[in-house]
Amino acid sequence: MQKPKKDKVSYLCTECGDSFAKWYGQCPSCKAWNSLSENRFVEGPAGASAGPAEGAKLITSTVTAEPLVKTGLKQFDQILGGGVMAGAVILIGGEPGIGKSTLLLEVLRHAPGVYVTGEESLAQVHARAARLGLKENLDIVQGNSLAQIFDYVHAKKAKLVLIDSIQTTYTDQRTGFAGSPAQIREVTQRIVEFAKSNQVAFLIAGHITKDGQIAGPKLLEHAVDTVIYFEQNPTSRYRFLRAVKNRFGATGDVAIFEMTATGFREIENADSLLPVQEIGGIGSCLFPQLEGTRVMPLEIQVLVTPTGFANGRRIGENIELSRIHLIAAILE
């Protein structure tokens, strides 16, 4: 009589993604404290095999590369290396409300695909699409189950899938709630396997923590092909897309967008970011800063007042104080 299978238990570090057979207060790999969480999964039947692997020699291979999918956003395509490659898994991280969902909908304006929402209702997504002026026949589906998402993509024969978000998607192959380290790890691995085997590109939105890192184990960033961070100044309407990992292009490139009532507007000329005023007057100067392949003009403003103390006090905003001390020492 065959014994029932038992759940295997391991402990997953939410910081580095390594797993261990027992719990530690401090991760042996990355030395983070209280970062290990329980991970349960059912082991498959012994000796199970997915069949022999199929491949071809690179020199004699007749496989032709599929054309890149253009998103319609010129700067976004440039960051991705010219467009979205078939089978690529792209992770877009950013704070809540920064515009990740809007960016994914903007992609559907020019690139046909399936939009999967796990955070909002269909009515909410359609309302945003109408505000952006998108066509009505968008393929939008609400769901959180990864198996159902794969079935829908197979039925539609879609080549581009946009998931909002990775933290709300779950798989029945792992225990735990959606968004837990174990679920995020398993969902990510299965998406990557599905994307590569079916030549389907995935654009995935992800939340970030208070430290500015994408929520979930580090394996999430290691497994995907491209990691893009959505950044903003809290007092500005401008948004910055920065590639920190890219298997198909350069890293460090920056795309600049302006958030408007009808969606994102690309900023081609970075000079327009500076307000038209007395630039270069007393107490201010401009200097060019290289961001990837773009030159960004930045303004430095200095205000000096007399002091009654022996040593003056230096305060810096949006610049490290140690750098101010270094510049002051050089000038003196």
What are these regions (language model features)?
Residues 213-223:
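Short regulatory helix/loop adjacent to the ATP-binding pocket of P-loop NTPases
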Residues 182-203, 207, 223-234:
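Substrate-engagement module of ASCE P-loop NTPases
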Residues 28-32, 36, 42-46, 51-56, ...:
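Conserved P-loop NTPase
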Residues 168, 193, 210:
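Residues immediately C-terminal
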Residues 13-17, 61-63, 94, 171-178, ...:
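Short hinge/gating elements
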Residues 2-9, 14, 19-90, 105, ...:
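Detector for small/aliphatic-rich hydrophobic stretches
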